[in-house]
């Protein structure tokens, strides 16, 4: 129990003094020489992956802004002279300093992440960074599970909750006060001029979100790590205890005293957790009763410990054999494949019916058509229309845009078990391209295709389509069979909008 209590009472050695580089502002020149402080761990910070933030700020500018704020005498400025221009100048101050604050705070998190992998002999693999790398794992593991919890991660509405989340990691009170001051001032000016979206600071709020989720996952993973097997002692179930609804300031004491009861509830050897796009899924081989207990555990954890109002309706319990669950643009479900095997022993023969469970991932075509309709590629029914906003571009530019979008969609949804919906999306983009070019040249679609021939549509063939056409030019059965094979690419690091693929 002492080691559990030592873990729950956050170690003071992990707390950091973040604001000292700002106070001793002469040392802030170190930031300008290090280019984002990402070389300390020989790896890029986890908060900077696939983000082009290095070009959007300058530490030297922040240095000068801090000097100006120190030299400025705010007492001699009357209130009536605070016009809009001065307000935007102050907003620029807060924005730049908040960026630098996020850079400084990221350092211990990055170092802590690097130290956690030391001694584990993990090889660097860029394939594990791909979004598609999770799907082979799901196909291998989820076929043995029964239920999946689909949960939307709540985010605190009040700013003070975000400040309190970082209080365990911050040693000096000045850092906490400075963080609170910048956060409130920045949000006030953002609400004052909400039309200018370009002034938003994604790096600062990305750090807040990651720190919020990291705090939640540290508790959840600790409980999961200590679990091994479910015990059947009903009186130790934690959710039925009145002490759980005690005051928040006494939560740690209640948590430690009832620790065996919590582990008695959560002990499950088959449990997998995946977080993505502000959501997470929890797959397990359990009973409906246990899934409901997991559901209310998350609700009570968010409400009592993180002071975030969280409704149980935001947690969906999906039975894999009956329901579909949405995951990264796919609809996934378990399919039962019957395999009949004939076994013969001497003069007797037997028919053995084996049922295999296989995870199928299909395209959610309604959402893709909705995205295409929103960007004026088709109407809400999926009928292609001409792209009027691209009329001023050259023919080659228009064709390249459509081909790039079509190939990106085919590249991402190549793992679908049924390619019929994917072919429909390709058809919409092809016909939209032809209608756009025909409208630009003031011609009909039929006349335009007759003049250019079918070579125009061959540009939409993806790499795998061209390979299949070369390997199986005559065998229709083999070609159709290979077209049903799912392909997962390990070079997709992030998702962009369908139209803005570069």
Swiss-Prot record:
UniProt keyword ATP-binding present: no
Protein's name according to its UniProt entry: Maturase K
Keywords from the UniProt entry: Chloroplast, mRNA processing, Plastid, RNA-binding, tRNA processing
Gene Ontology biological-process annotations: mRNA processing; RNA splicing; tRNA processing
Record bears the keyword tRNA processing: yes
Listed GO CC annotations: chloroplast
InterPro entries in alphabetical order: Domain_X, Maturase_MatK, Maturase_MatK_N
Organism: Sinapis alba
Record family assignment: Belongs to the intron maturase 2 family. MatK subfamily.
Cited function: Usually encoded in the trnK tRNA gene intron. Probably assists in splicing its own and other chloroplast group II introns. Binds its homologous trnK precursor transcript.
Gene encoding the protein: matK
Matches recorded under HAMAP family: MatK
Subcellular location(s) per record: Plastid, Chloroplast
